Amino acid sequence: MPIFTGSSSDSEDERTIHKTTKLFTRQRSIHSIFGGGKVADILLWREPKIAATLVIGVSILWFLMEVVEYNFITLICHASMTSMLFFFIWSTASDFLNWERPLIPEVVLDESSFKQLARSFHVRFNQILTKLLDVACGRDPPLFFLTTISLYIVSIIGTYFNFVNLLFIGFVSMQTLPVMYEMYEDDVDTAAGKLMRKMKKLYKKVDTNVLSKIPRGTVKNKKFT
């Protein structure tokens, strides 16, 4: 039966209050966690022009679909027709006005960028699944309860938004939270460390006052003949 000693635990927390623990006990930098390539540079705004263009483009797409209430197929068709009309006028006018004809690259979308994005997503998704399974096995009870509460809050928030809005919120979060965390990493790690220590102290109290007092029957070994 676990014994909770408040004074020793408090003194240990006081001694370790200034020791900064990385969020989720990570050992690598945020840039390396996101793959360390161009995708990480965009997410952390080290490529500001590309990141800003991506945010503006996705925001315009969300505005047209959710505010103007454009149908997705209709939006794609209208955008394609507008682009084709623009290039048609440009190509036709260039013969009469001595303009330079539009240059069409052989490769419009780079294959390596897609591979890097897929690889980064695959690695990160596996890390999340591994961490969730590790937490679910009860190896870190405070983190288990914190994760359960967080998932419950997200499930409640999800009932007030449709799928497109959730995707947009997720995209904006991915483009803002990592770079904000990188800017204020020490402050966030310190606050997260304090929160985890409080959660562990709370779990010890619950374990001592509630869980340890629940009667448990002895497990008898069954003999098979």
From Swiss-Prot:
Top-rank lineage group of the source organism: Eukaryota
GO biological process, one term: response to bacterium
Transmembrane segments: 50-70, 72-92, 152-172
Record-level GO cellular component terms: endoplasmic reticulum membrane
Keyword Secreted annotated: no
Domain Reticulon: residue ranges: 39-224
PANTHER family per UniProt: RETICULON, RETICULON-LIKE PROTEIN B9
InterPro entries on file: Reticulon, Reticulon-like
Compartmental location: Endoplasmic reticulum membrane
Protein's UniProt keywords contain Heme: no
Topology term for the membrane: Multi-pass membrane protein
Gene (name only): RTNLB9
The protein's name in its UniProt record: Reticulon-like protein B9
Coiled coil: none
UniProt keyword list: Endoplasmic reticulum, Membrane, Transmembrane, Transmembrane helix
